[in-house]
């Protein structure tokens, strides 16, 4: 405890001198509320001061807090602004989150080219999550489709321990659709993914061994992929149905309330 009190005293002194890194550290400490009592107002003020002085870590921390809306009130516009500030200063986690937001297109308009740009910048810093998502986009999105970029991105992710990237590389070399089929390389990546706990890779290896040939394994893989897409589409349809049902119930309640208040005859 004495060590924490000493650290807080030092940070408070540095904050008085407008030290942006001290503002970031103290703001983050107040935001987390682990070693001291949480103070969201002080945390928000300190992180903002630090971010406006160009501290990429503070901009990311405050932006993420606004995005999540758990500790601070959600503020999407400010979250995106701060994450952009952090990402523009080269912070890979901010670049990844921005890329993911732009890819989902839920809180900001979807923009695949910007997605690829931010994810590439994060992947260049060996961020495995960004590299994996970049690989998926280059593999599936027509606007930026590029098999070589997909492989490059997946390899970065795989080299940094992403088993899904290893699995994707195994499938790419197994299919031999956009690159020459290479069963040795395919099995290398599939085994690597399976060793890292990827059940899809383990099932595919099992299918290859049971069927005794690659053609049957590929057919099995394609069937599984087709079934997965059917299930995904069905779940999406059910989700939309639930949302529409909720909307109808809400509209009905609003109409009933208006009628009760004499606003609608």
Where are the regions a protein language model picked out?
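Structural signature of tandem alpha-helical TPR/SEL1-like repeats
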Residues: 2-10, 37-46, 73-82, 109-118, ...
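Short helix-capping/linker turns of helical repeat alpha-solenoids
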Residues: 3, 17-20, 32-34, 53-55, ...
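Canonical positions in the second alpha-helix
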Residues: 13-14, 49-50, 85-86, 121-122, ...
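Hydrophobic face of amphipathic alpha-helices that form TPR/SEL1-like repeat modules
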Residues: 25-32, 61-68, 97-104, 132-140, ...
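Alpha-helical linker/edge segments of TPR/alpha-solenoid repeat scaffolds
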Residues: 71, 107, 178, 209-229
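Eukaryotic tandem repeat interaction scaffolds
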Residues: 92-106, 112-142, 146-164
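TPR/TPR-like alpha-solenoid helical repeat scaffolds
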Residues: 168, 199-218
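Non-Sec secretion/translocation targeting segments of pathogen effectors
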Residues: 263-265
């Amino acid at each position: 405890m004495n060590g924490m009190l000493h650290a807080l005293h030092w940070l408070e002194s540095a904050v008085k001198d407008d030290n942006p890194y001290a503002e970031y550290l103290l703001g983050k400490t107040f935001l987390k509320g682990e070693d001291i009592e949480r103070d969201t107002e002080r945390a928000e003020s300190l992180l903002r001061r630090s971010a406006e002085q160009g501290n990429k870590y503070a901009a990311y921390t405050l932006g993420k807090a606004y995005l999540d809306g758990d500790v601070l009130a959600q503020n999407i516009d400010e979250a995106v602004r701060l994450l952009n500030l952090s990402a523009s200063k080269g912070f890979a986690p901010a670049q990844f989150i921005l890329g993911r937001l732009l890819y989902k297109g839920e809180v900001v308009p979807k923009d695949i080219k910007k997605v690829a740009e931010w994810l590439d910048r994060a992947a260049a810093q060996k961020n495995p999550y960004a590299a994996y998502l970049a690989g998926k986009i280059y593999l599936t999105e027509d606007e930026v489709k590029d098999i070589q970029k997909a492989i490059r991105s997946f390899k970065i992710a795989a080299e940094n321990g992403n088993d899904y990237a290893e699995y994707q590389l195994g499938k790419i070399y197994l299919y031999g659709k956009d690159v020459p089929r290479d069963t040795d390389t395919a099995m290398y990546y599939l085994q690597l993914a399976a060793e890292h706990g990827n059940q899809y890779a383990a099932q595919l290896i099992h299918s290859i061994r049971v069927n005794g040939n690659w053609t049957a394994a590929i057919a099995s893989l394609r069937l599984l992929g087709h079934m997965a897409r059917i299930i995904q589409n069905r779940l999406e349809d059910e989700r939309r149905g639930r949302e529409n049902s909720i909307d109808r119930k809400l509209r009905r309640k609003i109409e009933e309330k208006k009628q009760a208040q004499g606003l609608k005859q």
